[in-house]
Amino acid sequence: MKILAIRGRNLASLEGDFEIDFTVEPLSSAGIFAISGATGAGKSTLLDALCLALYDKAPRFAASGESINLADVGDNQINQSDVRNLLRRGTSDGYAEVDFQGVDGHRYRSRWSVRRTRNKASGSLQPQVSVSYTH
C-alpha cells in the first residue's frame, strides 16, 4: 500500500479542513520526510487520521483495563477510549480520509466520520459511522 493523501476536518488540534497530498511536490519526490512541529500542532492527529480512516481505531485510544467516562455536551458522557473523542471540541462534525494505492495498483479511498445531532456543536454525538472504502 502506498499512501497518496490524508485529509480531514475538525480532529483534535486540527481545526477546519486539512490535507496532505503526497502526489505533489515537495512530497512526491521525497524518499523520506519528517513530521515536525510544536506541541499541539497536530503531528499525532495526522497519524490518528490515517488510522481512523483505514482501521476505525486510533492508537492513543487503545483499550485500557479501566472504563472511565468523560463529560461531553449537556449531561452526556463518553468513554475515554471512544475514538469519537477525537472530534474537536466546539465543532459539529469531523472526518478522516485516506487515498491510497493498493498492491493491485488501483486507487482507493477510505473514510471515517463523526457528527453531532442537528449538526450543532451542542448536539449529542451520533453513533459512529463505520469506515467506508471506495475504488
Protein language model regions, located:
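Extreme N-terminal "head/tail" segments of very large remodeling/mechanoenzyme assemblies
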Residues: 1-133
